[in-house]
């Protein structure tokens, strides 16, 4: 129950708050220095469940914060302040999602996974939710939570290292809930096909493509700068609306990087908190949050109303088809959280309400 604290003497607050938040955690209130209890939401003036969000400034973390007020939150630069706090619940959404960087330097990425394991150990939560990825599977087609473990041979470093973190977490916290996410959309989206469909403007260009387009347009010439990785990167100085109009009218734009035949599973982060809570209540240990596979061409048609996009790349298209045993628990049916039409309708609503 909520406890009003306005006007209450400091020593009484200390006694009440330390009792509520389990002073054995080693985190206490001192009237002399103020509130030092992560599990208390002082701004709201009420005692909250002792929960912590790691990764509060990230894409997933930001969407979780929009749905739930955590008693404490942190990110990579201040996470050590949470060591030893032993929250009732820690949602760890602080694993980097930069696939390109992970695959370019696997050892450095594995070191990040080791650091994540140590962070969780030092925080020592009573309950843990680890936000993971569909990328831990070399082939997601027809895979359920209870499917046999796959061979990791050929699995890119990004997926292999995050699978290792899952295994470490299971060793250290046997009752943890591990959540595997597919392609995502929600507030703050900055990548994937939906982002490309909205922006149209490529974030990076190969040198030869930059030279070709810069020769056609002074706007493109000034909009990109050569980066350390050898690509030309969007620098943000050009008129974005004019740049978008240029690429929308050009045969080459951000959509050129996606095969129209590729099938993805798009999950709305707006429902993540409620889905996690339902799974935790049911004591689920591994959760696949999966919607039906939809092709990029189907998404394009649903959003734009056009059927004139048929981009095909030399490499085989992506084909994701993760399944879940817990779909019914979360309001779905069969193996998925919704129908394909419901997924396309929700994506369309999101895309049409998007504001830069």
Q: Positions of the model-derived regions?
A:
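Short, small-residue-biased leader/transition segments that mark boundaries at the very start
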Residues: 1-3
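Short, positively charged and aromatic/hydrophobic N-terminal segments
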Residues: 28, 35-36
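N-terminal Rossmann NAD(P)H-binding glycine-rich loop of SDR-like oxidoreductase domains
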Residues: 51-68
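NAD(P)H-binding glycine-rich loop region in Rossmannoid oxidoreductase-like domains
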Residues: 80-126, 130-143
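Short-chain dehydrogenase/reductase
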Residues: 106, 151-163, 265-266
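Active-site Tyr-X1-5-Lys
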Residues: 155-177, 182
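NAD(P)-dependent short-chain dehydrogenase/reductase
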Residues: 175-265, 271
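Mid/C-terminal beta-alpha module of Rossmann-like enzyme folds, strongest
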Residues: 252, 259, 267-328, 340-356
């Amino acid at each position: 129950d909520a406890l009003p604290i306005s006007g209450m003497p400091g020593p009484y607050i200390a006694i009440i708050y330390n009792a509520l938040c389990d002073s054995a955690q080693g985190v206490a209130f001192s009237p002399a220095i103020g509130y030092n209890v992560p599990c208390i939401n002082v701004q709201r003036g009420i005692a909250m469940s002792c929960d912590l969000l790691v990764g509060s400034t990230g894409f997933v973390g930001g969407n979780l914060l929009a749905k739930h007020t955590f008693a404490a939150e942190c990110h990579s630069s201040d996470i050590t302040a949470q060591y030893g706090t032993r929250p009732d619940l820690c949602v760890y959404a602080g694993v980097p999602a930069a696939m390109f960087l992970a695959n370019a330097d696997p050892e450095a990425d594995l070191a990040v996974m080791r650091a994540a394991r140590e962070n969780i150990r030092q925080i020592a939560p009573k309950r843990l939710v680890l936000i993971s990825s569909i990328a831990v599977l070399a082939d997601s087609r027809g895979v359920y939570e209870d499917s046999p473990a796959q061979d990791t041979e050929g699995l890119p470093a990004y997926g292999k290292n995050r699978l290792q973190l899952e295994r470490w977490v299971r060793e250290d916290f046997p009752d943890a809930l591990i959540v595997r996410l597919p392609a995502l959309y929600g507030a703050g989206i900055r990548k994937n096909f939906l982002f490309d469909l909205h922006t149209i403007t490529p974030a990076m260009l190969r040198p030869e493509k930059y030279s070709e387009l810069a020769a056609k347009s002074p706007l493109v010439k000034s909009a990109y700068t050569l980066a350390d990785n050898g690509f030309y990167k969007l620098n943000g100085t050009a008129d974005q609306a004019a740049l978008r109009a240029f690429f929308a009218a050009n045969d080459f734009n951000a959509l050129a990087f996606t095969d129209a035949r590729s099938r993805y599973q798009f999950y709305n982060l707006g429902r993540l908190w409620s889905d996690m809570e339902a799974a935790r209540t049911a004591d689920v240990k591994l959760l696949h949050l999966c919607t039906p596979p939809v092709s990029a061409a189907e998404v394009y048609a649903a959003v734009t109303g056009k059927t004139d996009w048929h981009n095909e790349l030399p490499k085989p298209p992506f084909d994701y088809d993760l399944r879940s045993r817990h779909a019914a628990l979360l309001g779905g049916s069969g193996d998925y959280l919704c129908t394909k039409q419901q997924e396309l309708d929700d994506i369309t609503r999101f895309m049409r309400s998007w504001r830069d």
